[in-house]
Amino acid sequence: MDSKHVTESTSGQEDIQKTWWKEAIIYQIYPRSFQDSDGDGIGDLNGITSRLDYIQSLGVDIIWLNPIFLSPNDDNGYDISDYREIMREFGTMEDFDRLLKEIHKREMRLVLDLVVNHTSDEHPWFEEARKSRHNPYYNYYHWWPAEKGEPPLRLSYFDEEGNAWMYNKSTDSYYLHYFSRKQPDLNWENPEVRQEIFDMMRFWFDKGIDGFRMDSISLIAKDPSFPLIDSKKYPDIFSFYAKEPRLHLYLHEMNRQVLSKYDCMSVGEGSAVMVDDVAKFVDPAREELNMLYHFDAARIRNTTLPDNPESGIDYSLIALKKMFTEWDKAVDKGWPSIYLGNHDQPRMVSRFGSDKDEFRALSAKMLITFLLTMRGTPYWFAGDEIGMRNIRFDRIEDYNDIDTINRYKKAKAEGKDPQAVLDEQKETGRDLSLIHI
């Protein structure tokens, strides 16, 4: 792999810098369902190591692992209780070191998931924070004192009641959680929090990893005053949840203190980042991130629900082409990420092709060809290369995903038809793509 920077010119774009992560193919692995090495039914690090020759044979340059850190697994490992320990069912630090060594031996690279919008409520920081308002870790998180009354409305992705505030008796205050109740949001306003995160990143870079995929990174900056939201005056209410102006200051600080010190790759998950904003994240002159991936592709669906705009945009080739063209242009001097599916999305064959037996293989080849021939760095999800399709569940009891389960509970609590949730989740649920390979 050549990490030299060479200037090249492309149509309409000058001074694009060549580097290894622009010329790479990224293969995403959800460890739990990839390869089990010890017969306990759970994929693990040694299982991944045993499959490296296969992965290399695909032409893969970079492996991205979903979270492998210690976690109670309320949200598939995205609730981290220790950033410097390996999830026990995945193996040990020695297993990780062996995996990393074997990846590099094959001239591939390794990218880890960085989850720093929130921690687990079982992380030592939060266990201390929730004891007392006077605890030094209290300000590691966002709180609303009960004496100020009910907190201003903020919605949660995974809370069964939809409320992003949860009362904590010992501090007589509410903590913020944009995701589940067991995922309290970190307070990036606190410089001590930022330094803890930067130190943790250095720990993994010093071990030899090659980059981070940054989960929900657009959500880390909040206005700590939590103003009331007037949806009539401010139709883009998500600006109150994310993209707060300090976000770019934090990312630049991260780049200056950590990323710029290593030959590494950084890609951010751009929840609610609009096409007009993407250049702010990836313009090399701004020194923030290398790449950012967006969610507009996820809104184009083969199946949409009537009278439900959240269910997406009806699929058409024109809609898909228009969306990718807009994002490619908006990236400008930055570099695009190209993907059609991941751990949060249904299988690309089921969404953008046909998963019927007679068309499944053809669809998979067509979509992989698209990924590999677009300008940008392609990401594919393990199993796409064999045309894996969605599994479809008929009962809520079949689901493990907290998002699906809480959507179902919320619908029942509000007197809505829970079957409508099941019908939607058969097409869009996160569990659909996470079955064992």
Question: Where do the PLM segments sit?
Answer:
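Active-site and adjacent substrate-binding regions of carbohydrate-active enzymes
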Residues: M1-I435
